Amino acid sequence: MVSVEEIRKAQRAEGPATVMAIGTATPPNCVDQSTYPDYYFRITNSDHMNELKEKFKRMCDKSMIKKRYMYLNEEILKENPSVCAYMEPSLDARQDMVVVEVPKLGKEAATKAIKEWGQPKSKITHLIFCTTSGVDMPGADYQLTKLLGLRPSVKRYMMYQQGCFAGGTVLRLAKDLAENNTGARVLVVCSEITAVTFRGPSDTHLDSLVGQALFGDGAAAVIVGSDPLPAEKPLFELVWTAQTILPDSEGAIDGHLREVGLTFHLLKDVPGLISKNIQKALVEAFQPLGIDDYNSIFWIAHPGGPAILDQVEAKLGLKPEKMEATRHVLSEYGNMSSACVLFILDQMRKKSIENGLGTTGEGLEWGVLFGFGPGLTVETVVLRSVTV
Protein backbone atom coordinates (compact mmCIF):
# COMPACT_ATOMS: atom_id res chain seq x y z
CA MET A 1 0.00 0.00 0.00
CA VAL A 2 1.51 3.35 -1.04
CA SER A 3 0.53 6.80 0.18
CA VAL A 4 -0.72 9.63 -2.05
CA GLU A 5 2.48 11.52 -1.19
CA GLU A 6 4.60 8.63 -2.46
CA ILE A 7 2.56 8.44 -5.67
CA ARG A 8 2.97 12.18 -6.22
CA LYS A 9 6.70 12.03 -5.55
CA ALA A 10 7.12 9.16 -8.00
CA GLN A 11 5.31 11.15 -10.69
CA ARG A 12 7.81 14.01 -10.60
CA ALA A 13 10.98 14.18 -12.68
CA GLU A 14 14.24 14.91 -10.87
CA GLY A 15 15.89 17.38 -13.24
CA PRO A 16 14.72 20.38 -15.28
CA ALA A 17 12.96 20.08 -18.62
CA THR A 18 15.33 20.08 -21.59
CA VAL A 19 14.92 20.65 -25.31
CA MET A 20 16.29 17.45 -26.87
CA ALA A 21 15.74 18.04 -30.60
CA ILE A 22 14.49 20.69 -33.02
CA GLY A 23 13.05 20.35 -36.53
CA THR A 24 11.74 22.99 -38.96
CA ALA A 25 9.85 23.00 -42.26
CA THR A 26 8.48 25.48 -44.82
CA PRO A 27 6.25 25.15 -47.89
CA PRO A 28 8.24 24.87 -51.16
CA ASN A 29 6.92 28.18 -52.59
CA CYS A 30 9.44 30.95 -51.79
CA VAL A 31 8.68 34.65 -52.41
CA ASP A 32 11.33 37.33 -52.82
CA GLN A 33 10.51 40.40 -50.73
CA SER A 34 11.94 42.85 -53.29
CA THR A 35 9.52 41.72 -56.03
CA TYR A 36 6.61 40.85 -53.72
CA PRO A 37 4.78 44.25 -53.89
CA ASP A 38 4.40 44.01 -57.70
CA TYR A 39 3.23 40.40 -57.44
CA TYR A 40 0.85 41.14 -54.53
CA PHE A 41 -0.88 44.07 -56.23
CA ARG A 42 -1.14 42.16 -59.52
CA ILE A 43 -2.58 38.96 -58.02
CA THR A 44 -5.14 40.92 -55.96
CA ASN A 45 -6.21 42.99 -59.02
CA SER A 46 -5.09 46.18 -57.27
CA ASP A 47 -2.53 47.52 -59.76
CA HIS A 48 -4.57 50.71 -60.15
CA MET A 49 -3.86 51.69 -56.49
CA ASN A 50 -0.51 53.30 -57.31
CA GLU A 51 -0.09 55.36 -54.14
CA LEU A 52 -0.87 52.41 -51.90
CA LYS A 53 1.48 50.20 -53.89
CA GLU A 54 4.34 52.67 -53.32
CA LYS A 55 3.49 52.69 -49.60
CA PHE A 56 3.55 48.88 -49.54
CA LYS A 57 6.91 48.88 -51.34
CA ARG A 58 8.31 51.11 -48.58
CA MET A 59 6.87 48.76 -45.92
CA CYS A 60 8.54 45.77 -47.60
CA ASP A 61 11.84 47.66 -47.98
CA LYS A 62 11.85 48.57 -44.27
CA SER A 63 10.81 45.08 -43.14
CA MET A 64 14.41 43.71 -43.12
CA ILE A 65 12.96 40.58 -44.76
CA LYS A 66 14.71 39.10 -47.80
CA LYS A 67 12.33 36.23 -48.47
CA ARG A 68 9.35 34.32 -47.12
CA TYR A 69 7.74 30.95 -47.77
CA MET A 70 4.04 30.70 -48.57
CA TYR A 71 1.66 27.84 -49.24
CA LEU A 72 -0.49 30.27 -51.26
CA ASN A 73 1.02 30.40 -54.72
CA GLU A 74 -0.31 32.12 -57.86
CA GLU A 75 -2.17 29.02 -59.01
CA ILE A 76 -4.05 28.58 -55.72
CA LEU A 77 -4.90 32.30 -55.51
CA LYS A 78 -6.27 32.34 -59.08
CA GLU A 79 -8.54 29.42 -58.16
CA ASN A 80 -9.75 31.31 -55.04
CA PRO A 81 -10.48 34.93 -56.04
CA SER A 82 -12.44 35.56 -52.81
CA VAL A 83 -9.17 35.12 -50.85
CA CYS A 84 -7.57 37.88 -52.97
CA ALA A 85 -10.31 40.42 -52.23
CA TYR A 86 -9.96 42.78 -49.27
CA MET A 87 -13.13 41.80 -47.41
CA GLU A 88 -15.02 39.04 -49.22
CA PRO A 89 -16.61 36.06 -47.45
CA SER A 90 -13.92 33.41 -47.91
CA LEU A 91 -13.64 31.49 -44.65
CA ASP A 92 -14.76 28.17 -46.18
CA ALA A 93 -12.08 28.31 -48.88
CA ARG A 94 -9.41 29.27 -46.33
CA GLN A 95 -10.47 26.58 -43.85
CA ASP A 96 -10.42 23.90 -46.57
CA MET A 97 -6.75 24.73 -47.17
CA VAL A 98 -5.42 25.07 -43.62
CA VAL A 99 -7.25 22.10 -42.11
CA VAL A 100 -5.15 19.90 -44.42
CA GLU A 101 -1.95 21.92 -44.78
CA VAL A 102 -1.30 22.90 -41.13
CA PRO A 103 -0.95 19.28 -39.85
CA LYS A 104 0.94 18.32 -43.04
CA LEU A 105 3.61 21.02 -42.55
CA GLY A 106 3.68 20.18 -38.83
CA LYS A 107 4.40 16.54 -39.70
CA GLU A 108 7.41 17.59 -41.78
CA ALA A 109 8.95 19.52 -38.87
CA ALA A 110 8.04 16.83 -36.31
CA THR A 111 9.61 14.06 -38.43
CA LYS A 112 12.91 15.96 -38.48
CA ALA A 113 12.81 16.54 -34.70
CA ILE A 114 12.02 12.87 -34.00
CA LYS A 115 14.88 11.79 -36.28
CA GLU A 116 17.35 14.04 -34.44
CA TRP A 117 16.06 12.83 -31.06
CA GLY A 118 16.84 9.28 -32.20
CA GLN A 119 14.26 7.50 -30.03
CA PRO A 120 11.22 5.49 -31.18
CA LYS A 121 8.12 7.68 -31.59
CA SER A 122 6.24 5.25 -29.32
CA LYS A 123 8.12 6.95 -26.45
CA ILE A 124 6.27 10.25 -27.08
CA THR A 125 3.82 10.60 -24.19
CA HIS A 126 2.40 14.09 -24.83
CA LEU A 127 1.69 16.25 -27.88
CA ILE A 128 1.23 20.02 -27.88
CA PHE A 129 0.05 21.42 -31.21
CA CYS A 130 -0.21 25.16 -31.73
CA THR A 131 -1.54 27.13 -34.70
CA THR A 132 -3.16 30.50 -35.34
CA SER A 133 -4.24 29.20 -38.76
CA GLY A 134 -7.76 27.77 -38.77
CA VAL A 135 -9.86 25.80 -36.27
CA ASP A 136 -11.29 22.29 -36.60
CA MET A 137 -12.65 19.31 -34.62
CA PRO A 138 -11.01 16.91 -34.08
CA GLY A 139 -8.08 19.29 -34.26
CA ALA A 140 -4.69 19.47 -35.92
CA ASP A 141 -3.33 17.59 -32.87
CA TYR A 142 -5.52 14.60 -33.77
CA GLN A 143 -4.59 14.83 -37.47
CA LEU A 144 -0.88 14.91 -36.61
CA THR A 145 -1.23 11.91 -34.28
CA LYS A 146 -2.67 9.98 -37.23
CA LEU A 147 -0.13 11.32 -39.78
CA LEU A 148 2.85 10.41 -37.58
CA GLY A 149 1.41 7.13 -36.33
CA LEU A 150 1.72 8.12 -32.66
CA ARG A 151 0.13 5.93 -29.99
CA PRO A 152 -3.64 6.53 -29.65
CA SER A 153 -3.04 7.06 -25.90
CA VAL A 154 -0.74 10.07 -26.46
CA LYS A 155 -2.00 12.97 -24.29
CA ARG A 156 -2.87 15.85 -26.63
CA TYR A 157 -3.15 19.61 -26.08
CA MET A 158 -4.49 21.76 -28.93
CA MET A 159 -3.83 25.50 -28.87
CA TYR A 160 -5.69 27.54 -31.48
CA GLN A 161 -5.60 31.29 -32.19
CA GLN A 162 -2.95 32.32 -29.67
CA GLY A 163 -0.89 34.44 -32.05
CA CYS A 164 2.73 35.50 -31.95
CA PHE A 165 3.51 34.92 -28.25
CA ALA A 166 2.64 31.23 -28.41
CA GLY A 167 6.16 29.95 -29.16
CA GLY A 168 6.86 30.83 -25.53
CA THR A 169 3.55 29.38 -24.32
CA VAL A 170 4.23 25.92 -25.77
CA LEU A 171 7.64 25.74 -24.08
CA ARG A 172 6.10 26.81 -20.76
CA LEU A 173 3.45 24.10 -21.00
CA ALA A 174 5.97 21.48 -22.19
CA LYS A 175 8.21 22.30 -19.20
CA ASP A 176 5.33 21.78 -16.75
CA LEU A 177 4.37 18.49 -18.38
CA ALA A 178 7.93 17.13 -18.53
CA GLU A 179 8.82 18.05 -14.94
CA ASN A 180 5.60 16.75 -13.39
CA ASN A 181 5.31 13.45 -15.27
CA THR A 182 8.38 11.27 -14.84
CA GLY A 183 9.61 9.84 -18.14
CA ALA A 184 7.39 12.18 -20.17
CA ARG A 185 8.56 13.04 -23.67
CA VAL A 186 6.61 15.96 -25.11
CA LEU A 187 6.41 16.60 -28.84
CA VAL A 188 5.72 20.31 -29.40
CA VAL A 189 4.62 21.49 -32.86
CA CYS A 190 3.88 25.03 -34.06
CA SER A 191 2.57 25.19 -37.63
CA GLU A 192 1.49 28.44 -39.28
CA ILE A 193 0.05 29.10 -42.75
CA THR A 194 -0.94 32.61 -43.86
CA ALA A 195 -3.90 31.38 -45.94
CA VAL A 196 -6.19 32.62 -43.14
CA THR A 197 -4.79 36.17 -43.10
CA PHE A 198 -3.91 36.84 -46.77
CA ARG A 199 -6.14 39.46 -48.39
CA GLY A 200 -6.02 42.30 -50.89
CA PRO A 201 -5.03 45.86 -49.94
CA SER A 202 -7.24 48.66 -48.59
CA ASP A 203 -6.22 52.29 -48.22
CA THR A 204 -8.45 52.65 -45.15
CA HIS A 205 -6.85 49.78 -43.19
CA LEU A 206 -3.08 50.10 -43.36
CA ASP A 207 -2.51 47.78 -40.36
CA SER A 208 -3.81 44.91 -42.52
CA LEU A 209 -1.15 45.83 -45.08
CA VAL A 210 1.57 45.60 -42.40
CA GLY A 211 0.67 41.93 -41.92
CA GLN A 212 0.83 41.33 -45.68
CA ALA A 213 4.40 42.70 -45.65
CA LEU A 214 5.59 40.63 -42.66
CA PHE A 215 3.87 37.25 -42.32
CA GLY A 216 5.29 34.00 -43.70
CA ASP A 217 4.56 30.26 -43.38
CA GLY A 218 6.56 27.75 -41.38
CA ALA A 219 6.40 24.91 -38.87
CA ALA A 220 8.79 24.03 -36.05
CA ALA A 221 8.87 21.08 -33.67
CA VAL A 222 10.82 20.31 -30.50
CA ILE A 223 11.06 17.30 -28.19
CA VAL A 224 11.05 18.24 -24.50
CA GLY A 225 11.82 15.93 -21.58
CA SER A 226 13.53 15.81 -18.17
CA ASP A 227 16.26 13.44 -16.95
CA PRO A 228 17.76 12.62 -20.38
CA LEU A 229 18.87 9.06 -21.07
CA PRO A 230 22.49 8.49 -22.21
CA ALA A 231 21.29 8.25 -25.84
CA GLU A 232 19.45 11.60 -25.63
CA LYS A 233 21.37 14.83 -26.21
CA PRO A 234 19.92 17.92 -24.50
CA LEU A 235 20.34 21.26 -26.32
CA PHE A 236 18.87 23.73 -23.81
CA GLU A 237 17.40 23.57 -20.29
CA LEU A 238 14.06 25.32 -19.67
CA VAL A 239 14.77 26.88 -16.28
CA TRP A 240 11.95 29.38 -15.58
CA THR A 241 8.86 30.71 -17.38
CA ALA A 242 6.36 33.53 -17.03
CA GLN A 243 3.43 35.06 -18.88
CA THR A 244 2.14 38.59 -18.38
CA ILE A 245 -0.28 41.10 -19.90
CA LEU A 246 1.39 44.49 -20.37
CA PRO A 247 -0.24 47.49 -18.66
CA ASP A 248 -2.23 49.93 -20.84
CA SER A 249 -1.92 47.66 -23.88
CA GLU A 250 -5.53 46.65 -24.52
CA GLY A 251 -6.28 46.50 -28.24
CA ALA A 252 -2.60 46.92 -29.21
CA ILE A 253 -2.67 43.66 -31.17
CA ASP A 254 -5.84 41.74 -31.87
CA GLY A 255 -7.23 39.33 -34.42
CA HIS A 256 -10.79 38.30 -35.22
CA LEU A 257 -12.00 35.23 -37.09
CA ARG A 258 -14.74 36.41 -39.45
CA GLU A 259 -16.43 35.32 -42.68
CA VAL A 260 -13.56 37.11 -44.45
CA GLY A 261 -10.90 35.06 -42.64
CA LEU A 262 -8.65 36.16 -39.78
CA THR A 263 -8.38 39.95 -39.58
CA PHE A 264 -5.48 41.60 -37.76
CA HIS A 265 -5.34 44.99 -36.09
CA LEU A 266 -2.15 46.59 -34.85
CA LEU A 267 -1.60 49.86 -33.02
CA LYS A 268 1.43 51.92 -33.94
CA ASP A 269 2.95 51.93 -30.46
CA VAL A 270 3.43 48.14 -30.14
CA PRO A 271 7.27 48.47 -30.25
CA GLY A 272 7.05 51.23 -27.62
CA LEU A 273 4.84 49.17 -25.30
CA ILE A 274 7.20 46.19 -25.50
CA SER A 275 10.45 48.16 -25.05
CA LYS A 276 8.95 50.13 -22.14
CA ASN A 277 8.15 46.92 -20.22
CA ILE A 278 11.03 44.65 -21.24
CA GLN A 279 13.35 45.63 -18.37
CA LYS A 280 10.75 44.65 -15.76
CA ALA A 281 10.38 41.19 -17.35
CA LEU A 282 14.16 40.72 -17.41
CA VAL A 283 14.61 41.79 -13.77
CA GLU A 284 11.92 39.33 -12.65
CA ALA A 285 13.59 36.54 -14.64
CA PHE A 286 17.29 37.17 -13.98
CA GLN A 287 17.57 38.91 -10.58
CA PRO A 288 17.39 35.54 -8.75
CA LEU A 289 20.40 34.43 -10.85
CA GLY A 290 22.34 37.59 -10.02
CA ILE A 291 22.34 38.70 -13.67
CA ASP A 292 21.75 42.34 -14.59
CA ASP A 293 23.97 42.68 -17.66
CA TYR A 294 21.72 41.68 -20.54
CA ASN A 295 24.65 41.60 -22.96
CA SER A 296 25.99 38.65 -20.94
CA ILE A 297 23.05 36.41 -21.95
CA PHE A 298 21.98 35.01 -25.34
CA TRP A 299 18.80 36.35 -26.93
CA ILE A 300 15.84 34.77 -28.74
CA ALA A 301 13.07 37.33 -29.28
CA HIS A 302 9.97 36.92 -31.41
CA PRO A 303 10.69 39.11 -34.46
CA GLY A 304 7.29 40.76 -34.75
CA GLY A 305 8.97 43.35 -36.94
CA PRO A 306 12.26 45.28 -37.11
CA ALA A 307 10.93 48.22 -35.05
CA ILE A 308 10.33 45.97 -32.02
CA LEU A 309 13.89 44.61 -32.16
CA ASP A 310 15.40 48.08 -32.73
CA GLN A 311 13.58 49.61 -29.76
CA VAL A 312 14.38 46.72 -27.40
CA GLU A 313 18.06 46.97 -28.40
CA ALA A 314 18.08 50.73 -27.84
CA LYS A 315 16.25 50.56 -24.50
CA LEU A 316 18.63 47.95 -23.05
CA GLY A 317 21.83 49.06 -24.80
CA LEU A 318 22.21 45.64 -26.42
CA LYS A 319 25.13 44.99 -28.75
CA PRO A 320 24.01 44.39 -32.37
CA GLU A 321 25.20 40.76 -32.32
CA LYS A 322 22.75 39.89 -29.49
CA MET A 323 19.84 39.80 -31.96
CA GLU A 324 21.83 38.16 -34.78
CA ALA A 325 19.96 34.82 -34.76
CA THR A 326 16.61 36.62 -34.36
CA ARG A 327 17.28 39.00 -37.26
CA HIS A 328 18.55 36.13 -39.42
CA VAL A 329 15.25 34.26 -39.06
CA LEU A 330 13.22 37.44 -39.74
CA SER A 331 15.32 38.06 -42.87
CA GLU A 332 15.09 34.50 -44.23
CA TYR A 333 11.49 33.60 -43.29
CA GLY A 334 9.52 36.68 -42.18
CA ASN A 335 7.21 36.60 -39.15
CA MET A 336 5.93 33.00 -38.82
CA SER A 337 3.94 33.75 -35.66
CA SER A 338 4.34 31.02 -32.99
CA ALA A 339 6.98 29.05 -34.95
CA CYS A 340 9.51 31.92 -35.08
CA VAL A 341 11.25 31.52 -31.72
CA LEU A 342 11.74 27.78 -32.32
CA PHE A 343 13.37 28.55 -35.69
CA ILE A 344 15.66 31.00 -33.84
CA LEU A 345 16.48 28.36 -31.20
CA ASP A 346 17.47 26.03 -34.04
CA GLN A 347 19.55 28.71 -35.78
CA MET A 348 21.33 29.58 -32.52
CA ARG A 349 22.43 26.06 -31.62
CA LYS A 350 23.55 25.36 -35.22
CA LYS A 351 25.64 28.56 -35.51
CA SER A 352 27.08 28.09 -32.00
CA ILE A 353 28.28 24.57 -32.85
CA GLU A 354 29.49 25.65 -36.34
CA ASN A 355 31.52 28.50 -34.87
CA GLY A 356 32.94 26.32 -32.05
CA LEU A 357 31.60 28.63 -29.34
CA GLY A 358 31.60 26.06 -26.52
CA THR A 359 27.87 26.11 -25.69
CA THR A 360 24.60 25.89 -27.63
CA GLY A 361 23.94 29.52 -26.57
CA GLU A 362 26.73 31.38 -28.40
CA GLY A 363 29.29 30.33 -25.78
CA LEU A 364 27.19 31.80 -22.93
CA GLU A 365 25.47 29.89 -20.12
CA TRP A 366 22.20 31.80 -19.68
CA GLY A 367 19.69 33.12 -22.20
CA VAL A 368 16.19 34.49 -22.64
CA LEU A 369 13.38 33.66 -25.05
CA PHE A 370 10.57 36.19 -25.51
CA GLY A 371 7.19 35.79 -27.19
CA PHE A 372 5.14 38.94 -27.93
CA GLY A 373 1.55 38.86 -29.17
CA PRO A 374 -2.14 39.71 -28.80
CA GLY A 375 -3.13 41.16 -25.46
CA LEU A 376 -0.45 42.57 -25.43
CA THR A 377 0.91 39.34 -23.95
CA VAL A 378 4.57 38.62 -23.21
CA GLU A 379 5.96 35.13 -22.60
CA THR A 380 9.38 34.90 -20.93
CA VAL A 381 11.49 31.72 -20.84
CA VAL A 382 14.87 31.53 -19.09
CA LEU A 383 17.14 29.11 -20.94
CA ARG A 384 20.39 27.47 -19.90
CA SER A 385 22.66 26.33 -22.69
CA VAL A 386 24.50 23.02 -22.88
CA THR A 387 28.25 22.57 -23.30
CA VAL A 388 29.24 21.28 -26.74
UniProtKB/Swiss-Prot annotation:
It catalyses: (E)-4-coumaroyl-CoA + 3 malonyl-CoA + 3 H(+) = 2',4,4',6'-tetrahydroxychalcone + 3 CO2 + 4 CoA. The active site is at C164. One of its GO terms (biological process) is polyketide biosynthetic process. Pathway: Secondary metabolite biosynthesis; flavonoid biosynthesis. Its EC number is 2.3.1.74. Pfam families: Chal_sti_synt_C, Chal_sti_synt_N. InterPro entries: Chalcone/stilbene_synt_C, Chalcone/stilbene_synt_N, Chalcone/stilbene_synthase_AS, Polyketide_synthase_type-III, Thiolase-like. One of its GO terms (molecular function) is naringenin-chalcone synthase activity. It comes from the Eukaryota. Keywords: Acyltransferase, Flavonoid biosynthesis, Transferase. The primary product of this enzyme is 4,2',4',6'-tetrahydroxychalcone (also termed naringenin-chalcone or chalcone) which can under specific conditions spontaneously isomerize into naringenin. PANTHER family: CHALCONE SYNTHASE 3, HYDROXYMETHYLGLUTARYL-COA SYNTHASE. Belongs to the thiolase-like superfamily. Chalcone/stilbene synthases family. This is Chalcone synthase 6. It comes from Glycine max (Soybean).
